Amino acid sequence: MGVEGCTKCIKYLLFVFNFVFWLAGGVILGVALWLRHDPQTTNLLYLELGDKPAPNTFYVGIYILIAVGAVMMFVGFLGCYGAIQESQCLLGTFFTCLVILFACEVAAGIWGFVNKDQIAKDVKQFYDQALQQAVVDDDANNAKAVVKTFHETLNCCGSSTLSALTTSMLKNNLCPSGSSIISNLFKEDCHQKIDELFSGKLYLIGIAAIVVAVIMIFEMILSMVLCCGIRNSSVY
């Protein structure tokens, strides 16, 4: 016997929320893949300074995001099917998956909050090491290539950790082509550009996580209400 009245409204409301959840999973998966293959981050995080690769903490978060997006699409489909079929078993499984996903999202949010400054800090340290090697050693071709990639990708020049007045002559050939010594002195600091690059992407991820968390809370409530409604309707 199918559900009636308010429970039937909850059934279709849950279906709509699950469809939105499925779409959100697709959007998160798409955004994560875009962040993974974004030319700016790819150019910088694929670099190597000698035997030392660029910090990959950012990519760890992206891989987690890809997995979350894929799981969300599966769970959203499961919720849609469970709601239409009025299956207590499927709805119970759906609720359990939501609880696990919500716990993982909270854990990922805590990890992201703790590491939000560390990601940019690690990249800036990597850049500073390459810049110091390139300035001190004329034969440090690998370091020069790393520095040039940073400068061309971010359209910046140099770091505040080195004096612009004492190193402008040495940095001139490392800055974007066409830059003069005078313009390089006033070009934006690479540390600031690195902060802007990663803070913008982390802000986007944070907004997406909050929206998904709100949807998940509503879905957990609706799935339990619908499950109870199905159980009560089967009694009568």
From Swiss-Prot:
The chain crosses the membrane at residues 13-33, 64-84, 90-112, 202-224. Pfam families: Tetraspanin. Not glycosylated. InterPro entries: Tetraspanin/Peripherin, Tetraspanin_animals, Tetraspanin_CS, Tetraspanin_EC2_sf. Cholesterol binds at E219. One of its GO terms (biological process) is receptor internalization. It is found in: Cell membrane; Basolateral cell membrane. The keyword Nucleotide-binding does not apply. Disulfide bonds join C156-C190, C157-C175. It is a multi-pass membrane protein. Keywords: Adaptive immunity, Cell membrane, Disulfide bond, Immunity, Lipid-binding, Membrane, Transmembrane, Transmembrane helix. Binds cholesterol in a cavity lined by the transmembrane spans. Homodimer. Part of a complex composed of CD19, CR2/CD21, CD81 and IFITM1/CD225 in the membrane of mature B cells. Interacts (via the second extracellular domain) with CD19; this interaction is initiated early during biosynthesis in the ER and enables trafficking of only properly folded CD19. Part of a complex that includes MHC class II/HLA-DR molecules and IFITM1. Interacts with IFITM1. Interacts with IFITM2 and IFITM3. Part of integrin-tetraspanin complex composed of CD9, CD81, beta-1 and beta-2 integrins in the membrane of monocyte/macrophages. Belongs to the tetraspanin (TM4SF) family. This is CD81 protein. It comes from Saguinus oedipus.
